[in-house]
Amino acid sequence: MKKMFSSLLAIFTSALLLSGSGIAVCAQGAETEISSADLSGAVLTIGEYEEENGTDISVLSNFAEGSYNYGDFLDANNTAVYNEFRKLVEPSTDKVTIELPVTVTFETSTSSASKFTDEDSTAFSQAVFGACKPGIDSVLFDYPEIFWLDSANMSISIGNDTKCSYSSSSGKYKWKVYTIIITPKYYDVYGSLADVSEYKEKLEDAVDAFAVEGATRYDTLKAVHDKISEFTYYDTAATFSDSPIGALVEPGVVCEGYSEAFKLCCDSLGIPCVLVFGNYNAEAKTAHMWNYVQMEDGKWYAVDVTWDDLDNASVVKYAYFLKGSVSFNTNHTPSADYIITQLTYPELSTDDYVPGAQPVYAQGDLNRDGSVGVADLVYCYNAVMGDEVKYSCDANADGRVSSLDITYMRKLLMS
């Protein structure tokens, strides 16, 4: 699965360009203005940093009701990046300017980037990439329709409003970054932005035409799983192997394409689904990707369409369909560390999903979402006020729905 690793490291090879013109300066306390601060000509890549320092850096789906999005777990700066980058569902190569809610700071031993030590470069790359890469990665995980973005060639520059000062007490130069500018680029396989738009339309048409039938969520997901397997095949050499294009438009795909296509179809059907990265082997430079999907019982189950279709046979397998952690994790290991970015996955059910089994809900889980919380109290209140609801709100089991059920739910939530 070497192509998965290449995709994983794509953003690691994106050039980080530091603006060298008009860098502002400031003085505060024991700090002295540095009018000669020079960042011109400095070029860094995340790949070089990862190679030298390792990867341990802390730092409608599409927002349909009940969905799970990695963008919900970001800090303020990366949320700002996320909100700008998700607009790229409409392809564009225009520069994206992000005003950072929280000033990014780092210290160096010199005011000239050309004289940065390894320690200076590390401090710089940690600060800047930590403020933007998790946001970019989360967008690409939450929005697989941004299939065209070649993060390997995205230039990232800091704004001309960056300031530098010298601290006599520490003997260090302190930098303050207020703005990050990122220039998107499409993969070379697309000759122009017009080509990107053409394939975007083809993908949308394929998803819209992806008719599946099923009386239950299980039946629907099984149909999605089967149709993807029947349409495409595993092929590392295919033109669109690491894209949902290869799973839904032009056959030939690897794990990224399988899982992204599965998520796109689930998104269109309103079924919560996420991409999961794992089986990461840094030495062998391999990795894998699959899906977690939420069923009506509120629990999450694993689906690996790739491994159910590896032999390209006409017979569809279900060895990795709606599995719990006990069986699935024998050969699947999710990785929370997506090289700088930290991913927070939904908790996987322990047991495999059993179709037709009656789900058991916790006391107070009135809306049947798998958890007991304020949403259940609101659900109960709406029912008492006369709204039509799907599930019974007789929380105290007295045979009727009344204000006593609201009181019961309040006590339950406070206990």
Which sequence ranges carry the predicted segments?
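N-terminal accessory/pre-domain segments preceding catalytic cores
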Residues: 26-215, 331-361
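Secondary-structure boundary elements
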Residues: 188, 193-248
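Sec-exported extracytoplasmic/periplasmic mature domains
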Residues: 208-212, 226-234, 263, 267, ...
